């Protein structure tokens, strides 16, 4: 016979698995549609018209039209495509289901059009809203927070292809003063995360790891080097943190999402022309291309890091629907490769992983997620002790500093007033 605690854990296991599978399937369908549209916009259409896909006019034109299209969706769709991601954390309160169609369309347009944001925030919003709405009908005794936790865990598992990230994140958020053991509370979220990760793995494998030279043995000087690299990445990230709310306020003075996002798309197009096609889109596939291109120099990596960080700030400030984690990882990789090219004595494994740790820590202010992203992009167990040590001064630097998020005004924002 099972203990009552075990029966309590099993009670939510079936809904957890269902939510994990559904979270993954929603992500897969959205990404597939965006991929088809991206291929049409950036491969087939310019080929048919006899225009090079890296033509400045094409890049600026597509991104400007993408901004206008997303602005029209936000302007006229019910619920105005959900909340502005610049004002929201990764895991937020559930939104009304009526806002989801507009949010899905805005997300797909942004992903396909080359906007420098990832899918993580909108997908999280969609899955949480659906889980809460459906779960409240089927099992009204279960509170909204439980559905929110299960949906966010399933989405994290689906996004990263492993339940490890969910385990790390929720080990701190669920660790309250309750007498219920932590792993009892983690059971259902981990079931959801595992189901989401396994479902994603059936269709495609998220490819985060980079082909970077193996790091052999940790030395004391490597800790100092890693801390300096993380500090440089944090400094770059804090510039973006300072710029985001100011640019957001300036852009939203126009009070018209079509105009705001059209201008935002135009600026992104100019940045894309300067940085080239590798600086477009969410950044995961592009960072693989960046590492594979042996022709890039120190100045090229620096330019890509600056352009991508600027594009991230512009896209977020303009109100595009997307997340900031994936493009931040690209910035970390570019910074790390630049620092390795500048000081070849410091292994690329250290510069890249510590730069990712620093920049993701600025964006998320989540130590576990930052460690996870650094470890999966540069998968080397020898680096784990070094990353844990480097995390300590990095966390000290960011203690009490503002987050990369805009404080929502007391009144409704312009996009929701329209």
Swiss-Prot record:
PANTHER family: CHLORIDE CHANNEL PROTEIN CLC-E, ION-TRANSPORT PROTEIN YFEO-RELATED. CDD domains: Voltage_gated_ClC. GO terms for cellular component: plasma membrane. Belongs to the chloride channel (TC 2.A.49) family. Pfam families: Voltage_CLC. It is a multi-pass membrane protein. GO terms for molecular function: chloride transmembrane transporter activity; monoatomic ion channel activity. Keywords: Cell membrane, Ion channel, Ion transport, Membrane, Transmembrane, Transmembrane helix, Transport. SUPFAM superfamilies: Clc chloride channel. Its main location: membrane. The chain crosses the membrane at residues 10-30, 54-74, 99-119, 120-140, 149-169, 186-206, 223-243, 258-278, 300-320, 322-342, 343-363, 371-391. It is found in: Cell membrane. Signal peptide: none annotated. InterPro entries: Chloride_channel_YfeO (IPR022969), Cl-channel_core (IPR014743), ClC (IPR001807), ClC-type_chloride_channel (IPR050368). NCBIfam families: PRK03655.1. The keyword Transferase does not apply. It comes from the Bacteria. This is Putative ion-transport protein YfeO.
